Every structure is written in structure tokens, then in C-alpha cells.
């Protein structure tokens, strides 16, 4: 195990945070691991893992976020709404394929339904699995392109009336991405860069693999490497790659860290505020709360907002405590498994750090 921690030595609390992260890292077994914390703009980064460090420091590698890409999609939608370019209640089919005949339930699906997993759509299209299963551990998404995602949506038969039940859906968020691209006449990757990445200064965040040796390499549970993820037509749901330092920048914008510069564009400030606001309760006695794009839990130190993600060989966790200046980003390069401790460890850092 190799460890590095970085934080200004003169800042009160920094050594304590470094010790907390070093202790937490012992619970995670992965070739590469990064645990990063921002406290009121002061960053502490712990790197480690069972593999030998490469020529690029672990905290400067871009990691696959998987489903932790969805907060980026949510912020993009919120900003487009703030700009008046779309509305949450716009019907997706009307924007994506005006006049195309669809099932009445599909006609009722709005942009809000797609983002909040209340569209009634399944997690993935039914015809996704036959082409994915033969290559489930290597490239399940690459053979299912954008036009196929759109066609699957237009011919869908939702399981439930839109807006009545919560069911996590990569399919739905992917459709949201294609719908926003159609509504604005701008490819998703360009739209995300213009509206989210560039304004927040996320220069090391992208949706495609970067130059050689700049991306982290994922691993199966047995330690063998896996190829970089190709998300096919599911880009909006899981294609973002970012360095842990960029992840902290993204989270610091959400947490409202006092020393961070206020967004120059009021629509960005409005979007950041909107995605922090609880909008949905579900489950037994409405115990589970969600914002537009974040899971929302209570903690001893106030509410926490978070999202985790996993790909074929990597994992990521993003979380923050609004109004407290605390943000946590974590990445690991081993495929998730039943006894995996990565998410629980990162969640513990977020919820138990004083």
C-alpha cells in the first residue's frame, strides 16, 4: 500500500482529516484508491492501493464515474431550465420526435420524470440484453448505439403511469440526454461542456477516454485489467470520466463553499440551488428522499447529498453536506462485488466526519 496526503499543514483540522482518510482506506481493497475531502476549500487527498503507482499520480488520473455521471446530467437540465430553453414538464417524445406515434404513457413522460426515475421505464431496454449478455464482462453497452436507445423509447410500454413510482433507470436518463440534444440542436458532449464543464472549470472531466496514460485502468475482482468503458447510446447515464481533483471542484460548487467564486451566470447559480432541493419521497413511509439528481439522507451533522457509480472495473462516490463546506470524492479501480466496502467507506467519511 502506498499513501500520500496533501493539505496545508497550517490549517486546523487538516492532520485529523488525513488520519481519518488513511484509516478509512485500510477498509478498501483495490489496485488504485483515492479518497479526497474538501473542508471549506481546504483539500486533503489520500491515495493508495495494492498496485504500484504509475508515472501519473493517482489523483491526476481520470476515473470512470458510471452512474455518478447522473448529477452532471441533472445540473445540465437544471441550467437549461433556468435559461428558459426547456421546461421540466416538457414531454420528451414531443421534443425528441414531434408527431411520431407513441404509446399514451410514453407521451406523458416529461423531462422531470426521466431525471427522477419516475418515468415508468425499465432500467434498460428489453432488447438490450440479448446483445449485451455475450459480452457482459467486456463491452455490454458499446453495441447499443444512440439511435437504438431512441427507438426503444419511442416504442416503449411503461410499466407504471409516469410520476407514480420510482424505479432506477439508466434507460430513462440516457433518453433525457438524447432529448436535450434534440431540443437544443447540440450534441450531448458539446452541450455538457458548454453548460457545465467549462463554466465550473472542469478541465479534466470528459465523456471519452483521454490521451494514453491519463485514464485509470479498471480491474476485475481477480485483479485482471478491463478495457475502457464504451457506453454506446447511454452516454448521459454513465459516460463521465474525471480526476478526483475535478470531482472536488464539481462538489465544491454544489456545497456552496464560501471561498469559491460565485458563478458569474445567475442561471448556473440557480441550477446549483435547484439540484440541492428535495423534490421526491418514496418507499415505506416515504423514508427515502431525493433531489432532482442526488440521493438525500440525514446524518448527525445535517443532510447529505450523494451518488455512487460503478463500471466494469471502477467505482466512484460523490457526496457533500450542504451549508457545511464538506465534500467527499472517492474512486477505486476494482469491480464492485457483494462484500465490497468502497461505497460504505466513502459514505462513512461523508456522514461521520465532524
Language-model segments: which ranges?
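Short, conserved catalytic-motif segment at the N-terminal edge
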Residues: 11-65, 87, 209-210
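Short, surface-exposed loop or secondary-structure junction motifs
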Residues: 42-45, 103-311
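Short, well-ordered beta-strand elements
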Residues: 44-46, 307, 315-334
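Short, glycine/proline-biased beta-turn/loop segments that scaffold the active-site neighborhood
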Residues: 87-102, 200
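Short, gly/Ser/Thr-rich active-site loops of penicillin-recognizing serine hydrolases
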Residues: 280-285, 299-300, 332-354
